[in-house]
């Protein structure tokens, strides 16, 4: 009995010493836990409900993610999740895209000027006045309008196949150029394949190394939205208006020369619409570029997202 009491006392002493041990400094270091929760919100902008995805701490540097055609904020789902530990990320859907309101083309002017004005007002209402932009496809004409209107607000540009040069217009524009020359039933009809499920799938898989690595949810979501009444009319209006972006290229190039914004290029070189020549052209106006070319297509994040997100993280820390 005496031995049992001694053993019990010894065990209690060992436990007490263990509890009083100084904590390992490695264990007490603060950790960067990923804030992977993405919030799905809406904001009324001049009578239009703008849907947007948001993640990360608003006290961290902000990156505004501007999507392309035919997509929505959905194209940035990986970025919103993976980079939210160090950055505040916000990705709006343009009017007529994603989960935002889709006013009829008879009631709403679908031009890049008008869409950019809504995104500018959206950021104003969100009180976001210092931010980097990530641009892709349609995100470039939206983003460069924001940048030229308020250059002091732009902290950096992350460019994934967002064009600003005539040299960057590829073979994929031939049908749309015919629409610019003469918009009629024939030139519109020639573009309708783009809105089919097969045409949308092609946009995501053309130029990729492994098409089977591209999530089919991307083009299936876009196709469902293409089935809405007047959706084709809305997109044809924007195709037709794209020629006005080209007229603004000199203005955007001057912005780049005058302001020399930090620029990260992460470009899919096999893009039929914006080939690598579009990426190369930025070297004419920006002195220092973090320049990265990928052997993939129009939506480089789909196939090379992990490396691109690593590049974004490194670039934004410089």
What is the role of each PLM region?
Residues 84-93:
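Active-site machinery of serine-nucleophile hydrolases
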Residues 21-31:
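Bacterial Sec signal peptide processing site at the extreme N-terminus
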Residues 65-68, 91:
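Structural cue for short, hydrophobic secondary-structure segments
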Residues 70-78, 89:
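Serine-hydrolase catalytic-loop signature spanning alpha/beta hydrolases and amidase-signature enzymes
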Residues 29-50, 55-58, 62, 90, ...:
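Flexible "cap/lid" subdomain of the alpha/beta-hydrolase fold that forms the substrate-access gate
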Residues 17-18:
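C-terminal motif of bacterial Sec signal peptides marking the signal peptidase cleavage site
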Residues 68-71, 137:
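Active-site glycine-rich loops that stabilize anionic/oxyanionic intermediates
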